[in-house]
């Protein structure tokens, strides 16, 4: 079915329909254009969002980069950024393949439609002009027929009139004959016009207009087909990016699944483990000795206000770990401020310190406190600490790791320089064999420079190896001290201090000595110190599991133990995050070995 046959008389309908089709095409182009703008704005907002939350140029030294949570978040942001890029591709595809092409096609369709309707209107105008000519010839024929009939009646009447002259009758007959001739000519012209009009009308309705209508039908069908293809381009633009978007979503899923809480905890240990030994138990400070002593002995034997107690107190405090952000000094003990009170209040002779200025006493107290605070600051590695080449400003464990990193970097640089030296030697040999390729002497400066770099790097490697060995020994010694100190709970302090008897015994010998504060403490006062070393000879702890040595280990460093491949060992302590595990051999030897050299089975 075609429009030329079925809709031969629906010219205006076809005109409205084709115009509606072009309007629909323009409407779809406008819709796609706004859709592309929405996609572009969406992609722009996504990129701005990613830029807002993406870390600013993270480096390998940033601690946050090493956590899986941060790495997953960065990967998630990168996937969102890639997703935004795919939305930009959708917007670009819609703008080029749909908006531009369909807009251009719409203009072509409008021109073609205009041409077809102009042709139809021109044919219709020609048919109307032919019909007007036919009407004119018809009216002329009708008029001439009436004039001829009138002239014939006039001639007949004059012919029958007896009073009319022969000339009048003859003139009337000639006039009637003329009118008859004119009517005959008008008839012939009318017949010719009618025949011509019928031919033109048949051509118009059966040939010319059907062809125009068929062209309009073909144009409209092509427009509809192209519009349908444009509808398909909308979905095709989405389908083209679906695989990449799927990969982005899969990457987001992988980023979510790559969060490893256990590993992050281990990373935190690796970043901030200091390697210091845990602080020891506080010693019992018996301030009742001041009360039990004789006032005269107290004033004569301890002119500096019981330096023994103050030394023991400072010694025990130095072992404490400063957990707080700010380490406030402990208030001075009662013995420091009031050690001379019994002598001043008693009836005996006054103490040598009784006449001293209280400000001088406080000055001595501040001198005893300030070094302790300084040791805390150096212990923690404060902000004002100056970084050194051997990283001694860091805690032992962090120092060991940084030295290990520096050593690995130097070894890589050394290997690179050695490879370059070998390459230069080979090039020099080639130049010596084939002088036309180059001058061997031109390579001497580069070879000398490479040799100098190698020597320098070797010295640095030796230096860092020595520092690393020292740092590892510090870590192992700190770990051993902590283990021996906390192998068993300490004994509770007794009510009677260990130096109570010795203080009264030694009081007589201190009467004639003004410098007793500079003498070492008595045996009773050293008892708590020896108690710490007695803990090293306690009964060995029971193993917590078994392990098998996968590789041979020499165990030449302090605190380590050697083992053979395939040897069965007893697991005494698990890895605390530093890569070492404490084991015991069947012969009884006990020490640390690398965790990666073991296959562990816990009880």
Swiss-Prot record:
The protein in question is named: Cdc42-interacting protein 4
**What are the top taxonomic ranks of the organism?**
Eukaryota, Metazoa, Chordata, Craniata, Vertebrata
Q: Where is this region: Disordered?
A: 295-358, 477-541
Say which family it is in: Belongs to the FNBP1 family.
Its UniProt domain note says: The F-BAR domain binds the phospholipid membrane with its concave surface. The end-to-end polymerization of dimers of these domains provides a curved surface that fits best membranes with around 600 A diameter, and may drive tubulation.
From the UniProt record, list the coiled-coil ranges: 67-259, 388-481
Region annotation (Required for podosome formation and interaction with AKAP9 and microtubules) maps to 1-117
Q: Which residues carry this modification: Phosphoserine?
A: 296, 298-299, 335, 351, 482
């Amino acid at each position: 079915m075609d429009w030329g046959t079925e809709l031969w008389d629906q010219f205006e309908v076809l005109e409205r329909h084709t115009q509606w089709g072009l309007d629909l095409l323009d409407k779809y182009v406008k819709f796609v254009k706004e859709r592309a703008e929405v996609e572009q704005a969406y992609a722009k907002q996504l990129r701005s969002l990613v830029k807002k939350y993406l870390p600013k140029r993270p480096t390998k030294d940033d601690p946050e980069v090493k956590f899986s949570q941060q790495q997953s978040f960065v990967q998630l942001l990168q996937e969102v950024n890639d997703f935004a890029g795919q939305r930009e591709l959708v917007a670009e595809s819609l703008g080029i393949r749909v908006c531009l092409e369909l807009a251009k096609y719409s203009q072509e369709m409008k021109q073609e439609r205009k041409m077809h309707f102009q042709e139809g209107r021109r044919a219709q105008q020609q048919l109307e002009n032919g019909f007007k000519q036919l009407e004119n010839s018809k009216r002329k024929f009708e008029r001439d027929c009436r004039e001829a009939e009138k002239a014939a009646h006039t001639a007949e009447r004059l012919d029958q009139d007896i009073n009319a002259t022969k000339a009048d009758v003859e003139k009337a007959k000639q006039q009637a004959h003329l009118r008859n001739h004119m009517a005959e000519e008008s008839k012939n012209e009318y017949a010719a016009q009618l025949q011509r009009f019928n031919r033109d009308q048949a051509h118009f309705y059966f040939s010319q207009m059907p062809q125009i209508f068929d062209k309009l039908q073909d144009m409209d069908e092509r427009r509809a087909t192209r519009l349908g293809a444009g509808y398909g381009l909308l979905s095709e633009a989405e389908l083209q990016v679906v695989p990449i978007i799927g990969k982005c979503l899969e990457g987001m899923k992988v980023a979510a699944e790559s969060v490893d809480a256990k590993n992050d905890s281990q990373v935190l240990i690796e970043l901030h483990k200091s390697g210091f030994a845990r602080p020891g138990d506080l010693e019992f400070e018996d301030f009742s000795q001041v009360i039990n002593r004789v006032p005269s002995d107290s004033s004569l034997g301890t002119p500096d206000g019981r330096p023994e107690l103050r030394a023991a107190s400072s010694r025990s405090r130095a072992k404490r770990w400063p957990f707080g952000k700010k380490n406030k000094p402990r208030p001075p003990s009662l013995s420091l401020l009031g050690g001379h009170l019994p002598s001043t209040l008693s009836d005996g002779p006054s103490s040598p310190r009784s006449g001293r200025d209280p400000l001088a006493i406080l000055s001595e107290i501040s001198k005893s406190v300030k070094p302790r605070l300084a040791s805390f600051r150096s212990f923690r590695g404060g902000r004002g600490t100056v970084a050194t080449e051997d990283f001694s400003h860091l805690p032992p464990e962090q120092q060991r790791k940084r030295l290990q990193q520096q050593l690995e970097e130097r070894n890589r640089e050394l290997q690179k320089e050695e490879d370059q030296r070998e390459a230069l030697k080979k090039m020099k040999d080639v130049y010596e064999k084939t002088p036309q390729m180059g001058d061997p002497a031109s390579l001497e400066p580069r070879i000398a420079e490479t040799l100098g770099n190698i020597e320098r790097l070797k010295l640095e490697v030796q230096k860092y190896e020595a520092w690393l060995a020292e740092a590892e020994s510090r870590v192992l010694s700190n770990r051993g001290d902590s283990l021996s100190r906390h192998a068993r709970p300490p004994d509770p302090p007794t009510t009677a201090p260990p130096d109570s008897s010795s203080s009264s015994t030694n009081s007589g010998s201190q009467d004639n000595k003004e410098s007793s504060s500079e003498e070492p403490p008595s045996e009773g006062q050293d008892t708590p110190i020896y108690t710490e070393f007695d803990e090293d000879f306690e009964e060995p702890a029971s193993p917590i599991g078994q392990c098998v040595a996968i590789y041979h280990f020499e165990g030449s460093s302090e605190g380590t133990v050697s083992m053979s491949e395939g040897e069965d060992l007893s697991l005494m302590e698990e890895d605390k995050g530093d890569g070492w595990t404490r084991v015991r051999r069947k012969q009884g030897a006990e020490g640390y070995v690398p965790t990666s050299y073991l296959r562990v089975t816990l009880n």
